[in-house]
């Protein structure tokens, strides 16, 4: 498939549970931001990119809490999608005490993301927010929930869900080009 994804609210109960199992304390709802990352498969380059993000978060006055490997089932994918599949991880960032929840915190996360994007050209930040998260990839709609078992968890709850499937007419499919994007769902023709 050319790509599909889903944008939801951050499922706090789900993340509180899975991060606790990793020994991470993310705090209360909207007290943290979650980044979804497409890293290189090569361990050295991946570790360098992860370290760079951690440094940037600290330089922007926030505390990096830890990484989570996102569970996936690549066996449901086609050969081409598996060949170029990134290493998918989530990074957790603590909200500074002097920054309000919501938009003010998301602005800080936005700046950290933009600085990181300038420093790491082989990593794609799928989303980084204290309010929403995007799960996406180069596959079909029917494969989304199977590929990402997180989405099947009973405690993964959201009041919104924007799903978008991409059929490219003039570009090659890629993991990064799958929709939805970080803030918008569109057909590529904003006039």
Task: List the model feature ranges, each with a label.
Residues 2-191:
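N-terminal segments that mediate ammonia production and transfer
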